[in-house]
Amino acid sequence: QGKVSSYHGDIPKLPLLSLLELGLLERRWQREMRNLPQDAPWAAARAGEWDAESIESWILKHVRTAGARDFARTLTRAMLCAEPRQVSYLCFLNYLRQGRGLNTLIGTEGGAQQDKFVGGAWQIPGRMAERLAGDIVLDAPVLAVEQDDDGVTVIARGERHRARHLIMAVPPLLASRIHFNAALPSKRNALNERMPMGSVIKIHIAYERPFWRQRGLN
């Protein structure tokens, strides 16, 4: 609406009742996420119940104030790049579990938002590429993977690349478009087809100087 507002900390200005409910929610999420085995969240006692519930349906059942509901939905969109109705509550709790809790995930000082790379994070793959020299093949989408007792053969744009081992570092949904011989387990195929990427556009804006710091906004 053309107005600029500011706040301190990780939580925006909300009505008192919403803030109190958010505090209770955070404690509940911390308690419930600790019930998930870190390497096997599906083995939790209430995994079936939580996986059958979307984040949105859970919010409607358990969150009363409008401010706390809106904040919980915003968290889902910001962290998972998906709508609350598209993600199970078990997935949400597991995300918190792997990220060491909500405060760490959204926090700046001592949290996930604290650090950045001078010059940009793109330098990580760039430096890795320098070490690999001429062993990188670009613009070659993989069509098929063949596996035998001696290793794997990767087929990409008509070329065959041989290796002892293969690390498949692509989104699960893209992996489902690759032909495997021998075939992947049926449960793995089903999982790949049911794990789409989030839908989001990120924009990075660079300014000549950090004017917001001079105004005491950061």
Name what the model sees in each region:
Residues 3, 150, 159-160:
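Short acidic/polar mixed-charge low-complexity motifs
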Residues 8-9, 151-153, 169, 198-200, ...:
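Conserved flavin/dinucleotide-binding core of flavoenzymes
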Residues 165-186, 204:
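Flavin (primarily FAD) binding-site architecture
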Residues 37-141, 148-151, 169, 177-179, ...:
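Active-site/ligand-binding neighborhood in enzyme catalytic cores
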Residues 156-165:
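Core beta-strand elements of the Rossmann-like FAD/NAD(P) dinucleotide-binding domain
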Residues 1, 66-72, 212-218:
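A short alpha-helix-loop-beta-strand transition element characteristic
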Residues 1-33:
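Dinucleotide-binding Rossmann-like beta1-alpha1 core, especially the glycine-rich loop
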Residues 187-215:
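Central beta-strand plus flanking loop segment that forms part of the substrate or channel wall
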